[in-house]
Amino acid sequence: MSSDARPPLRSMLFVPGTKVEWLAKAAAAGADAAVLDLEDAVPAAEKGAARERVAEAVARASGDMAIFVRINPLDGWPAVEDLRAVTRPGLAGVLLPKVGGPADVVLADRMLTWCERERGLPAGQVALVPLLESAAALRGAYEIGRAAPRVAYLGAVTGRGGDVERAVGYRWSPSGRETLELRSRVLLDVRAAGVPCPVAGLWTTVGDLDGLRAFAEQNRALGYEGMLAIHPSHVPVINEVFSPSPEELARYARLIAAVKEAQARGAGAVTFEGEMVDEAMAARARGVIAGACRGPRG
């Protein structure tokens, strides 16, 4: 499956690999995807047991919520064991942590292809989501995005106190002002690389839903199509922000009709509700409506 065939995902909720029973909470919250975490959320002594439980959960996956797994970094054998265990028909994608550059993506792509072949799955079925957690990875977002056709949902993740804050050295603030340029630059690289459905993150203050909404709205305004989340209470807010409202959809439908009527008269542009619009705006409107009809799981 090429990356441009991946469904849009508004919300991707992390679930500890030691707590696979929490998948029910993720589904109840309305998450478009759950990310079972085998990396940071699992102590070293529990990696093996968590891997088995996550693999079983992937094998049982059903319903509308996509299942992703964040594996361990490629610099250790656990990553290989993770991929072999979790690559099953129910796996939508893999989050690849600590990506250093395109070579890591190429290696992960080859490993996934081998695992898919081993399981009798079509090559490229499993999406690959590189996590840009170093200054070098952030600077190389374009090359990383082009490193494998299965790359999807790529974006800047600038949570408070995380790897990116340490790597870049900025001081986090609720306004997101200090990461605005960074998120914008990564988004431009991702779009230029042809990677659809860019996903941002991460809001770590569980109880501050107003702050979450403001951050999500800022990311949507930049051009991101979804966000990673760490708590079920964040999912409804994120889903709302990254979904077009009925009023927006109705306006887009009217805009398309107005442009079509103008074109039938031989006009290239037309005044619509006080604005000058043309085919470029109509194409954008058609894309939004198509995405809304397609839904998060296609």
Identify what each model region corresponds to.
Residues M1-G298:
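Expand to "…catalyze enediolate/carbanion chemistry for C-C bond making/breaking, isomerization
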